[in-house]
A protein has these predicted regions:
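Short beta-strand elements
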Residues: 528-544
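Glycoside hydrolase catalytic-domain context in secreted enzymes
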Residues: 1-506, 510-522, 526, 548-560
């Protein structure tokens, strides 16, 4: 229902050529050694026909990996080859298993453009690729706050004071295997300059000199495989800030966060703002507001941070994420009004970290413990049994994310699905049609403002919840409209299959759809419901029974 669902959708709808097994165990068994996961579920139940590859150095038992249906072991070690040969000699491993895996590897090779002699080019259209990156990043950026129509920037706003280290070293993406060697990375400062804004040169040089000096103190080799340390914000005296407030039209502050493999994020000075960031935010907003100037905060982050304690200070907040090589240009497009923001939050921003249901079971182990993970590729894990370090209990049950916040009526800073626009939208004329496969829902979305824009329409379903434990409502479909001119409308149609209404019956090991009155809820976020319509399923539906696998090996006390 929760953790396998996304993978199932990808496998069934996209039919990928390869699937990678992960490092972790599920209920006591490494994923790369789990026949239940890689064969019973992935192949027998979902019909997957492609190749499965391990993550680098994943798992411990090469023979078990081959038997489980892990076709390619990466990067490949001599001891793995030796153990497979020995298992073939003793009969522990059958040649049929090896042949099956080899066949899948060869089938992948036969499908590749290289094998088919595709005449690849050494001259890709890099400008076109950059244009796609710029557009995609802007589409996903989210306007969290916009008091007094601060954004888009007015025509008389030209001179800007830009504060924050990452304004000048914009974070393009995370660390580890997710990192890429981009050809260039456009900073916020460069993006704003390219859009015709004038940035304070003295402040820019002050930051560049400071960042250069601080980077020289870092032993970068130590952080080859983990997230590098955050550079503390430089100290700015109030006299300097006041001069900038007098000389410029407004201020921008960038808050940056980086993350990647080998270490999890932390609460203090990561989820929460650091003391130096709070000081910068307090000083800049107070002094610029005293001068009647506005302040915009740009969040150059890859995950959730705490916002409730400080979001009342700036006039506008843009969640820019980590926008790739064109990130600074993408932000400038939104700030200038060239692009109307249309992104929506894919997660909830809680008031406090402790408000999240998963907070009691999250492995907050710190960087030193994380460094051991890299060594354990070669030595194997220590074999201890420490909760939230060596294993984690997923005790939220089905109440993951917004489902938990809704069920227990927990106040949030920004709800799931939230995102503002420079214009406004109304929803009307809800309809639904029963089809052979499920339901087709539709509603009309109209741009009621004065600026062209897009809206992400979200469809939540509230189940009867009489015979099965169900969330208050769940997102079942969503779509983004085209660019709607002022006054223009679009009919949005969303399809929800009957199987999407099903829950997993643990006792019967099958999917089931309960009968009764359902509610279709059209919303602009999980807590901004615009339209409601009811429909009735008169007869319960029991789906095909599935294999009883991946059962928990520890006692779980799930939320209900």
């Amino acid at each position: 229902e929760i953790y396998l669902k996304g993978f199932e959708m990808v496998v069934k709808e996209a039919n990928p050529w390869t699937v990678m097994s992960s490092y972790n165990k599920i209920n006591g068994v490494y994923t790369s050694e789990s026949y239940d996961l890689l064969t019973t579920i992935l192949r027998k139940e979902w019909g997957y026909q492609g190749m499965v590859v391990t993550d680098w150095f994943g798992g411990r038992d090469a023979v078990g990996q081959v038997q489980a249906g892990n076709d390619l072991l990466m990067p490949g070690k001599i001891r793995q080859q030796d153990s497979i040969r020995q298992a073939l000699k003793t009969g522990k491993l059958s040649m049929a298993d090896v042949d099956r895996n080899v066949r899948r590897v060869l089938e992948l090779i036969l499908k590749t453009p290289r094998f088919k002699g595709y005449p690849y080019s050494e001259q890709p259209d890099l400008k076109a690729h950059a244009s796609v990156t710029r557009e995609a990043a802007a589409e996903g950026m989210i306007l969290l706050k916009n008091d007094g129509k601060t954004l888009p920037l007015a025509a008389d706003v030209r001179d800007i004071a830009v504060f924050g280290n990452t304004s000048y070293q914009f974070i393009a993406g995370g660390t580890g295997s997710g990192d890429v060697e981009e050809a260039y990375s456009v900073s916020l400062e460069e993006g704003l300059t390219g859009a015709g804004f004038i940035l304070d040169k003295g402040l820019k040089q002050h930051y560049l000199d400071y960042i250069r000096a601080e980077e020289a103190k870092i032993d970068w080799k130590k952080y080859n495989h983990v997230t590098p340390p955050r550079i503390v914000e430089c100290t700015l005296d109030e006299g300097l800030i006041r001069r900038k407030a007098e000389e410029t039209d407004m201020a921008m502050i960038t808050i940056g966060r980086n993350a990647g493999e080998y270490s999890d994020r932390k609460v203090k000075d990561d989820f929460e703002l650091c003391a130096d960031e709070r000081e910068m935010l307090e000083k800049v907003t107070r002094i610029f507001h005293q001068e009647g100037k506005k302040v915009v905060v740009i969040l150059n982050i890859g995950g959730v941070i705490e916002t409730a304690s400080w979001k009342d200070r700036p006039d506008a907040i843009l969640l820019a994420w980590q926008g790739g090589q064109e990130g600074g240009n993408s932000v400038a497009d939104i700030l200038s009004g060239k692009v109307n923001p249309s992104g929506k939050l894919p997660m909830t921003f809680p008031v406090r970290y402790e408000d999240a249901a998963s907070s009691e079971n999250f492995p907050l182990i710190g960087d030193e413990e994380a460094l051991d993970i890299y060594r354990e590729f070669y030595t194997g894990p220590k074999g201890t049994d420490r909760p939230n370090i060596d294993f984690t209990r997923y005790e939220e049950g089905i109440y993951v994310g917004y489902r938990y916040f809704d069920k227990y009526r927990v106040d949030v800073s920004y709800p799931f699905g939230f995102g503002l626009s420079y214009t406004g939208f109304t929803y009307s004329k809800p309809r639904y049609l029963r089809t052979e496969q499920g339901y087709e829902f539709s509603c009309t979305v109209t741009n009621t403002g004065k600026i062209p824009g897009k809206e992400v329409v979200q469809l939540y379903i509230a189940a009867p919840g009489k015979t099965m434990v169900k969330p208050q409502k769940e997102l079942k479909a969503f779509a983004k409209t085209k660019i709607l001119a002022p006054g223009e409308s679009e009919v949005v149609r969303l399809v929800v299959g009957l199987s999407e209404l099903a829950s997993f019956d643990e006792q019967a090991s099958c999917w089931a759809v309960e009968s009764g009155r359902y509610l279709a809820i059209w919303g602009s976020s999980s807590r901004d419901c615009r339209l409601k319509q009811s429909f009735t399923l008169r007869q319960a539906v029991t789906g095909e029974e599935v294999h009883r696998v991946l059962l928990p090996v520890r006692q779980l006390e799930e939320l209900y």
